From Swiss-Prot:
Belongs to the SEC16 family. The modification Phosphoserine is found at residue 46. Its main location: Golgi. The gene is SEC16B. Disruption phenotype: No visible phenotype under normal growth conditions. One of its GO terms (cellular component) is Golgi apparatus. Disulfide bonds: none annotated. GO terms for biological process: intracellular transport; protein transport; vesicle-mediated transport. It is found in: Golgi apparatus; Endoplasmic reticulum. Keywords: Endoplasmic reticulum, ER-Golgi transport, Golgi apparatus, Phosphoprotein, Protein transport, Transport. This is Protein transport protein SEC16B homolog. It comes from Arabidopsis thaliana (Mouse-ear cress). Residues 82-109, 487-513, 984-1013, 1025-1062, 1163-1204, 1216-1235, 1306-1361 are annotated as: Disordered.
């Protein structure tokens, strides 16, 4: 910034110089005579006042129109001068325009006394060759006449090789950076009120650096170096250098002011000026005129950033004034329709600085006039738009595109009493506004076009104006390079013009239009924007979109990968999209086919990523430790610790504990090397050697005398812990544990790993986290460590948690999981280290829980307490899946059920980024894991997974539910053919009937099955052997090409078979009986032909139906039902088929009396009657058992009459468990079988097989006989009696309390029940009726069953009848 002394040297002129210069009365001799006068003389001001006085000068006409060309300085009133060294005073109330002058809102002037200010300036030395200069004010003749301008370049040696300088030097030396100045020969200073003057020493920030313009509203001229530049300032006029005269160009209208060219005097202007723009003027007329007003012509200082004010799609051409080409609409349009948007009057707004500690910079645009020699009352003035800009500091760099303002020129009638638009009424629109110098073109005939608002537009032809285009930040301090303006460093009230409607193009709530963005399924990003230009021109509100809207469907992964934040360092590299896209696991681990090599590669990459420089050291160290722990778990099949009590030697060589301990040791070494972990001390007190010698001698003497207790106590007090542990081990386990505890508490530092291990060995886990010490003994001359700082809680334990966890893991003790778990809780709650806490939980093998306030583990490394909504991140899900996979390596049946919902979430995340195939694999893996679950939440999870899988499948098929892809269609047809060929070919052949030699019951049972095949619509009873599948499940087959094996359940006996009609198949075929009685079908050609013809037609029909599906939307109700229920027959009957003839009813079974057999010796029935003559048993009588139906063997019942041979011998007979009878205690049945009447071959009633003898039974059932145990032999009570042996009741597991009917003796020794009451078992408690002939005297052995307390819980309830 130029100093005051520089201004004093440059301003060494006086009033006489200008008077003589204007009156053409100046001569070189006078200039030389006055060259010695160098002082500035003012009436009452200081040396700096001449600067302000000179800055208020302007070139203008004679106020009175006399044309004498005198210098007149207008009266200034209520001016406020700011002489501060750093700052400018804000303008509170901008003054209005005086009737006789034009206001300079920010002129730098001081308050002047009286109504006139005179300046006495010393004469400057001029060359003697200077000619006279006169002012000519005649119409058609230039107002300035130059006789000889060469004198300004004379005397180069006097002015540092530049002479006095040219006319441009006269102003540029005032300010080395001033440029783009225009001026006239006449000077007039405007009058104004409440003017704010800034000290010129402090009004420009970064003045020297930016080639900017000095902040003076001063009269100045343009920096020109030749006559061509002067001719550009006066369009229509030409300067003749030889004669020094100005001549008007023929055919040119001076009032048009067309083709103005603006040049910049700064050295950098040529480097930044690029484009062309058009200037638009608006003329505003006033209501009245006041006589005697002075026409004031000010200068317009060009702003360096000159954007044309129009959108980029508007292209102008000088050949077509008044028109512009719209590149979007591809057509020419009139500029008048576009200019109507600028009719709105700005509103005054006081912009408030909203950001604290911010500076407000105001750029003052210059007033500029276009002089019309015919209309002396016309003044062209720019509306003033002060742009506020907020900065954080003076050293910030700015993008010039964010510093924007708008200038609009308005020609104004000088005779106006009051202006319609004044600078005081113009408002400033804050924010990032574009610097627009609004230019327009138009024909001369439309010079004054009235508008409804009373604003007339003065439209010149197209002009060439340099436009600054700057892309990138410019490093400078709060000097706006783009505008080359000065900056005031204090907030002010500033005015501007809002050239657009604030509500134009906005919604009802005032929001501007914007593009619409939405996310689509499958990683799609849908973008909808308006291409009609409404977004670009929304601030003007005058253009209507003609280009329409466009919808773009983008891949989300490509958009994210192309962004700058995706590849940047920091947390973004581990962000959501990065983890799913580039760092995702290689497919589902559980239920997938991932290779171990790929998995270890992924782990190595993640661990290496934790060591990057951008990640925080503490977090990176913990995350690396967690991933390394998971890798160890995969290497040792899900085990991080060996079971307690395993081989200690194996633990040291190759075990999970050794790997985990090594991991913590490496982490500790890294921390010590990096200075993060100090070396810890373990011992509290070190007794001196002399004291240790005394203690050892005393302990030795006590042991020699046999006083072990006193020796142990002496060793503990003297801290001689070695001998103390040996003595305590001899005294017992309790003494040993107590000694270890005393040593840990009294000598080891709290929180040290050695103390932790000693306390765990002593069985004192509660003392691990204590910080107190019981050592209060001080030894004379002992070496004590520095006192420990008082610590709260278990902070000392947490400081070295890695070492403590490592020593606990490597040295397994009882219940150390509780200590590890508590350590993790403390790390989470007190330190907030979630990763460290989860490391402890994984080593302690804690279970994963569902989300709750008390759950410890939901996802590995995720804090569900602190971040309940976002803890389910992709990284945490990947780590948890890795842990689940390590567990399944050791146990293939392991399922982490609570983790399956997070897998579904991960599948959704993968689908969002476009990885649909991987997401579908996860859905299939989750469904596979949920097969075994039966809880309600599992069923809900299955529905979610199925819906997601279906949505992915439909999306992959292009939105169609049926996949008609040629490759997949072939597979569907092949599966379909395979399912159709299953019916004619048939499944598993029916098994041959199983029979047992010598077992009449089995033959009769098979005979009943064979006869049942004659019944219509019935299904034969299962006759397959145990090698065949169960009867309720038919052979499985592939169904419908779905790849799933489905078991088709058979129907019950009463359910009709709608798929097959055995009556129709048997009607046309001949039947024959086999030798064994099994019905066989004759294979005839007609049957086979019809069968295969139906098969071929069915294939053709179904194939055509699947491939050529009907496009109609009619419901397919299927064929009419051919079956109906016949109320008379009480069964289902097929239409058109004769019902089978009614079969004859079965004859009644033979009566019991017809098969009485007295061969068993039951004649003496009185011997069996007890003394009371009452049988309270509900079982059959001996007479009933002597019927023709043979009694069932005592070793089996009627439900297991068939022999247990072959495979059946390996299975448990639930109806006849072993141990119910014993050959030694039970009386065998007679060897001779009882006779029975012959049974017809085709008898249709069930006849049980004859019971096998005991010997045969024992031979047929060797396995069962060997497993029978004697249960009641030890409890028998032998009683001498002449009566025959009583009826034996077979014992069942729950019949200990049954009354011994017939004996009169209860189990507990009480008397029997009265005859009116009886007891029956709630289970199948039948009585054995096997007796032997009376070969001995009347004696009987009453058997008392032992009632053990162990069977009380298994006893069945007895029913009182």
């Amino acid at each position: 910034m130029a100093s005051a002394s520089q201004f004093l040297l440059e301003d060494q002129t006086d009033e006489d110089f200008f008077d003589k210069l204007v009156d053409d009365a100046y001569s070189p001799t006078e200039a030389q005579a006055s060259s010695s006068v160098t002082e500035l003389k003012f009436d009452d001001e200081s040396d700096s006042d001449d600067i302000r006085a000179f800055s208020n000068l302007s070139i203008g006409k004679d106020p009175l129109g006399g044309g004498d060309g005198t210098l007149n300085e207008a009266i200034l009133g209520n001016d406020v001068a700011n002489e501060g060294a750093s700052g400018s005073v804000g303008e509170d109330e901008p003054s209005s325009i005086a009737p006789e002058a034009v206001q300079f809102p920010h002129s730098d002037a001081r308050e002047l006394r009286d109504d006139e200010m005179r300046s006495e300036v010393a004469d400057m030395p001029l060359s003697e060759t200077a000619k006279e200069c006169t002012i000519v004010n005649e119409p058609g003749i230039p107002g300035v006449k130059e006789l000889d301008w060469g004198s300004f370049d004379a005397d180069l040696s006097v002015n540092d090789g530049r002479g006095f300088g040219s006319y441009s030097d006269f102003f540029t030396e005032l300010d080395a950076t001033a440029g783009n100045l225009q001026g006239k020969a006449d000077v007039a200073v405007a009058t104004g009120g409440n003017l704010v003057a800034n000290d010129t020493n402090n009004t420009s920030v970064g003045f020297e650096q930016h080639q900017g313009q000095l902040h003076h509203d001063s009269a100045s001229g343009q920096y020109v170096d030749n006559s061509q530049s002067w001719e550009n300032l006066y369009p229509g006029w030409k300067y003749d250098a030889s004669t020094g005269q100005w001549f008007q160009v023929d055919g040119h209208d001076a009032s048009m002011n067309s083709q103005e060219s603006y040049e910049n005097s700064t050295s950098n202007w040529e480097n930044v000026a690029a484009n062309n723009s058009d200037v638009a003027y608006q003329r505003q007329s006033t209501a009245s005129a006041v006589a005697g007003t002075v026409e004031n012509v000010s200068t317009w200082n060009q702003v360096s950033q000159v954007s044309n004010g129009y959108p980029e799609h508007m292209v102008f051409d000088s050949q077509y004034p008044g028109w512009y080409y719209d590149t979007i609409a591809q057509e020419w349009r009139s500029l008048d329709s576009y200019n109507q948007a600028f009719q709105t009057t700005g509103q005054a707004n006081d912009q408030q600085v909203q950001n604290g500690n911010s500076f407000t910079a105001v750029d003052h645009s210059r007033e500029s006039n276009v002089h019309d020699v015919y209309d002396k009352n016309q003044i062209l003035r720019t509306q003033k738009f002060d742009i506020q800009s907020q900065h954080g500091s003076w050293d910030q760099s700015y993008y010039d595109k964010n510093q924007q303002a708008t200038n609009m020129w308005q020609p104004e009638n000088a005779g106006a009493a009051e202006a319609a638009v004044t600078p005081a009424s113009l408002s400033n629109s804050g924010g990032n506004q574009q610097v627009n110098n609004l230019y327009s073109t138009g024909p001369v005939a439309e010079q004054f076009k009235p508008y409804e608002s009373g604003v007339q537009s003065f439209i010149p032809q197209h002009m060439n104006v340099a436009n600054v285009t700057q892309n990138g930040p410019m490093s400078f301090s709060n000097g706006f390079y783009s505008r080359q303006e000065s900056v005031d460093d204090a907030p002010q009230s500033f005015q501007s013009s809002q050239l657009f409607s604030p509500s134009a193009g906005r919604s009802s709530d005032g929001r501007p239009p914007h593009a619409l963005v939405n996310f689509g399924f499958g990683g799609k990003l849908i973008l909808m924007k308006d291409d009609s230009g409404s977004l670009q021109n929304s601030s003007f509100g005058s253009q209507k979109g003609t280009g329409g809207s466009s919808i773009s469907v983008l891949n989300l992964a490509e958009v994210i990968s192309g962004s700058a934040s995706y590849s940047s360092l920091g947390e973004n590299s581990l962000s959501y999209f990065s983890c799913l896209d580039q760092q995702s696991l290689p497919g589902p681990l559980v239920g997938g086919n991932v290779g171990s090599k790929d998995l270890h590669k992924w782990l190595d990459e993640r661990i290496l990523n934790c060591e990057s420089s951008y990640m925080d050291f503490s977090r990176g160290k913990l995350l690396k430790m967690l991933l390394s722990l998971l890798r160890i778990s995969c290497q040792y099949y899900g085990k991080l610790r060996s079971p307690f009590g395993s081989d200690a030697l194996q633990k040291e060589t190759d075990s999970a504990e050794a790997a985990v301990a090594k991991l913590f040791a490496i982490a500790k070494e890294d921390g010590v090397q990096n200075g993060y972990a100090p070396i810890s001390q373990c011992l509290q007190h070190l007794p001196p050697e002399s004291q240790m010698q005394v203690t050892a001698s005393e302990v030795q003497n006590l042991l020699a005398s046999g006083r072990k207790m006193e020796a142990l106590q002496c060793a503990q007090e003297g801290h001689l812990w070695g001998p103390a542990l040996v003595i305590a081990a001899q005294l017992g386990q309790q003494f040993y544990v107590d000694t270890v505890k005393q040593m840990a508490l009294r000598q080891l530092v709290p929180g040290s790993p050695l103390r932790t291990l000693c306390l765990l060995v002593a069985g004192q886990p509660a003392e691990v986290f204590s910080t107190g010490s019981t050592s209060d003994i001080s030894f004379p001359g002992s070496v004590n460590l520095p006192p420990q700082q008082p610590q709260f809680g278990c902070s000392s334990m947490l400081d070295s948690w890695e070492e403590n966890l490592g020593i606990i893991t490597a040295n397994r003790t009882t219940d150390d999981e509780l200590v590890i778990t508590h350590l993790g809780d403390c790390m989470w709650k007190e330190r907030g280290e979630i990763i460290a806490a989860h490391i402890c939980y994984l080593i302690a093998d804690k279970n994963f829980d569902t989300y709750s306030d008390t759950a410890r583990l939901c996802l590995v490394g995720a804090d569900h307490w602190k971040y309940p909504r976002t803890y389910a991140s992709p990284e945490a899900i990947q780590r948890t899946e890795l842990y689940e996979y390590s567990k399944t390596l050791g146990n293939s049946q392991y399922t982490l059920l609570t983790f399956q919902p997070y897998k579904v979430m991960y599948a959704h995340m993968l689908a969002e980024v476009g990885k649909l195939s991987t997401a579908q694999k996860y859905c299939q893996a989750v469904l596979k894991c949920l097969k075994t679950g039966r809880s309600p939440e599992v069923e809900m999870w299955k529905q979610f997974v199925s819906s997601l899988e279906e949505r992915i499948r439909i999306h992959q098929q292009g939105g169609y539910t049926a996949n008609l892809h040629p490759e997949k269609l072939v597979g569907v047809l092949l599966n379909f053919f395979g399912s159709k060929t299953h019916r004619p070919v048939g499944g598993m052949p029916p098994p041959a009937p199983h029979s047992t030699k010598g077992n009449l019951q089995g033959n009769e049972y098979q005979h009943q099955q064979q006869e049942a095949t004659k019944l219509a619509y019935s299904q034969s009873v299962n006759t397959m052997s145990s090698l065949m599948p169960p009867a309720s499940v038919e052979p499985t087959h592939e169904s419908g090409g779905s790849g799933r094996r489905m078991a088709v359940h058979t129907r019950s006996v009463s359910e009709p078979d709608f798929g097959r009609t055995p009556i129709q198949e048997m009607a046309d075929s001949s039947k024959e009986k086999a030798v064994d009685g099994v019905t066989k079908l004759k294979s005839s050609g007609s049957v086979a032909g019809s069968r295969f013809s139906r098969f071929g037609f069915g294939i053709f029909k179904d194939t055509v139906g699947r491939v050529l599906a009907r496009s109609s939307k009619e419901a397919k109700l299927g064929a009419e039902n051919q079956f109906y229920y016949d109320d008379k027959l009480k069964r289902w009957v097929e239409r058109g088929v004769e019902p089978p003839a009614e079969e004859a009813a079965l004859p009644p079974p033979p009566t019991i009396g017809a098969f009485q057999n007295n061969s068993l010796g039951y004649e003496n029935k009185s011997d069996m009657i007890p003394s009371n003559g009452n049988w309270s048993s509900g079982g059959p009588t001996p007479s009933e058992n002597s019927s023709g139906i043979p009694p069932i063997s005592h070793g089996s019942n009627q439900f297991s009459a068939r022999g247990r041979t072959g495979v059946r011998a390996r299975y448990v007979d639930t109806y006849n468990p072993p141990g119910r009878g014993n050959s030694h205690t039970m009386i065998p049945s007679p060897s001779v079988q009882t006779a029975k009447p012959p049974i017809p071959a085709k008898a249709k009633f069930f006849v049980p097989a004859a019971p096998a003898s005991f010997s045969n039974d024992q031979a047929m059932e060797p396995a069962a006989a060997e497993t029978r145990q004697e249960e009641i032999s030890a409890d028998e009570v032998v009683a001498s009696s002449g009566a025959p042996p009583p009826m034996m009741m077979q014992r069942y597991p729950s019949m200990d309390n049954i009354q011994r009917n017939g004996l009169g003796i209860s189990v507990n020794g009480d008397n029997h029940q009265p005859p009116t009451s009886r007891r029956t078992a709630s289970w199948s408690g039948n009585f054995n009726t096997s007796f032997t002939p009376p070969t001995s005297p009347s004696t009987f052995k009453p058997v008392l069953l032992n009632s053990s307390s162990s069977s009380l819980g298994e006893e069945l309830q007895e029913v009182e009848l």
